[in-house]
Structure formats: structure tokens, C-alpha cells
């Protein structure tokens, strides 16, 4: 059974009529933040409390977190029905800048450096714990550089998983925090 929370307050559960949401669509894709879109009527208790870019949304399946994100739009139509669109936590990598750099070393070191830099620039709920890195280079030695600063998301894309190393980014939601993994093969999509 799926449930949705807004800042740890129950927003949707299928067995409580007053917490009804409509047209719920959760999209999770490879190497992407994913999206959550839903509609809510003005009779919903949280109708006026959801705030763009600050309310954290969490989707659970049988008490297991499968997706987290934030609201990026909340359009209201003439019938006073809101359409809420959310972006997944991986999109938070757009909230920080990775400076120009020259790097030589192991892939996991570069990935760790990029994520640690991101964490130093953002709030607590936008941070990631560095998770599993199963990507390997034949020599365990790569060279990467950029002559200009990049959004962290672009740095991860271009210098890690869209490079010759490839792989998949995955966010794991564990009790002790949200881990970002860079995997050679997917374990599961989140």
C-alpha cells in the first residue's frame, strides 16, 4: 500500500477519505530524479500548507521509502483544484556548484569529492551520504577536469556516469540517511 507524506505529515493513504489525492503518477527513471504529480481538492486538510521548494514529499510502499522530493509547482485551476508537481531528490544536485577542477585518481574518490562539495553548499535535507561505488576503471585511475564551474548535477553526469565509465546513480533511503550510489549494475530503481 502506497502512502505519501509532506514534511512527515500523512498526506495520502488510500483508506482515509479526507486524505484523498487524485491522478497520482510517480515516475522513476534510470539516472534521473523522477517526478511525482498529483491533484488535490480544496477540502484536503493540507491544501494550503504545501510550499514550493520547501515542503519535502516522501512516498512509501509498505513503510519502505521509495522516493523523496520537493514541490516545484502547485498550479490551481478555476475549480480550486491544485496540480502538484514534485522533482526527486537527485535534482537537488542542481542546487550546488562544483568549481573548476583537475582530478586524477580512483572513480570513487572523484564521486566522493563531488558529493562532499555538494553537501557543503546545501541544507541538511538536501544532502546525501556517499553510498556504494561499484564502478571500476581498469587501472583504478582516471583523469577528469573542467575549466569552468559546473552545476553539481552536470559534473556528476559528464564526469561520472555519462563518461566512458558509465553506470547508474541510485538513491537508497535508509534509516540513517539518504545514500547516493554509483553502480555498475542496478540493484533496484529508486
State the predicted function of each range:
Residues 1-51, 87-93, 99, 109:
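Juxtamembrane "anchor/assembly" segments of surface/extracellular structural proteins
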Residues 58-87, 170:
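Short beta-strand and beta-hairpin "edge-sheet" elements
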Residues 11-17, 67-72, 190:
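Short amphipathic beta-strand/extended segments with alternating polar/hydrophobic composition
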Residues 19-28, 71-76, 169-171:
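Short amphipathic beta-strand and strand-loop transition segments with alternating hydrophobic
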Residues 81, 87-190:
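Charged- and aromatic-enriched interaction segments used to assemble
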Residues 6, 13, 61, 77, ...:
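Acidic surface patches and DE-rich sequence motifs
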Residues 1, 49-55, 164-166, 176:
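A short, compositionally biased
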Residues 2-4, 36-38, 57-59, 71, ...:
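Hydrophobic beta-strand residues in large extracellular and virion-surface proteins
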